[in-house]
């Protein structure tokens, strides 16, 4: 790590260069307000114009038209909600008599971000350690990604095949995702 040398403002050569215009605006006019006050509105208005133009010239359907007489067997959410939908779908309705219906699924969904927030505190990171080499955080993120992909793919399948992804037959169709989340979150604590 080198030491930065500050310029000597009493130096006559440097003062001559500064007098000729070599300084903070040596490369031309300053970006603010001359350049940015012109470029920002042009870019923003151009983006809005392109979006409106594409919407007018090539309108796309928002979704299928509603038909109350042809309801699908299973209504699926958008693709990015598939893991959450799979958690709600596979958790049994009542495990204990005291827990109301689907409250356990909602608690499991809330445990995902809560468990993710605890990951930085699980690791005893030395201040001189490379922050990109965190084995616990890397392992948790890889396992979490695999579980999210597994839940997402399973949500698109029928309930009979959703837990095994149709790869093998299982007698335990109502296999609970609770075990997966217990393994995922509580094995590192």
From Swiss-Prot:
GO annotation terms (biological process): photosynthetic electron transport chain
GO cellular component, one term: chloroplast thylakoid membrane
Localization: Plastid, Chloroplast thylakoid membrane
Annotated GO MF terms: electron transporter, transferring electrons within cytochrome b6/f complex of photosystem II activity; electron transporter, transferring electrons within the cyclic electron transport pathway of photosynthesis activity; oxidoreductase activity
Family annotation (Gene3D superfamilies): plastocyanin oxidoreductase, Single helix bin
Keywords, alphabetical: Chloroplast, Electron transport, Membrane, Photosynthesis, Plastid, Thylakoid, Transmembrane, Transmembrane helix, Transport
Classification via InterPro entries: Cyt_b/b6_C (IPR005798), Cyt_b/b6_C_sf (IPR036150), Cyt_b6/f_cplx_suIV (IPR005870), Cytochrome_b_C_euk/bac (IPR048260)
Keyword flag Ligase: no
TM spans (from-to): 36-56, 103-123, 139-159
Membrane topology: Multi-pass membrane protein
ATP-binding as UniProt keyword: no
HAMAP family on file: Cytb6_f_subIV (MF_01344)
NCBIfam families the record matches: cytb6_f_IV
Family note: Belongs to the cytochrome b family. PetD subfamily.
Function: Component of the cytochrome b6-f complex, which mediates electron transfer between photosystem II (PSII) and photosystem I (PSI), cyclic electron flow around PSI, and state transitions.
Oligomeric form and interacting partners: The 4 large subunits of the cytochrome b6-f complex are cytochrome b6, subunit IV (17 kDa polypeptide, petD), cytochrome f and the Rieske protein, while the 4 small subunits are petG, petL, petM and petN. The complex functions as a dimer.
Protein name (record): Cytochrome b6-f complex subunit 4
The species this protein was found in: Pinus koraiensis
């Amino acid at each position: 790590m080198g030491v930065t040398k500050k310029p000597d403002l009493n130096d006559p050569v440097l003062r001559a260069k500064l007098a000729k215009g070599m300084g903070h605006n040596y490369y031309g006019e300053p970006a603010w307000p001359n350049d940015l006050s012109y470029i920002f509105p042009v870019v923003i208005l151009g983006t809005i114009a392109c979006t409106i133009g594409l919407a007018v010239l090539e309108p796309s359907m928002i979704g299928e038209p509603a038909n109350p007489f042809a309801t699908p067997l299973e209504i699926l959410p958008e693709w990015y909600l598939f893991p959450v939908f799979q958690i709600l779908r596979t958790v049994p309705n009542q495990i204990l008599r005291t827990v109301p219906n689907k409250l356990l699924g909602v608690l499991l969904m809330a445990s995902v971000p809560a468990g993710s927030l605890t990951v930085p505190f699980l690791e005893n990171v030395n201040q001189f350690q490379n922050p990109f080499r965190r084995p616990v955080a890397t392992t948790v993120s890889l396992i979490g990604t695999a579980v999210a992909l597994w839940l997402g793919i399973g949500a698109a399948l029928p309930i009979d095949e959703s837990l095994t992804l149709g790869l093998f037959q299982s007698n335990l169709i109502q296999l609970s995702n609770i075990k997966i989340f217990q393994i995922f979150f509580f094995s590192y604590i």
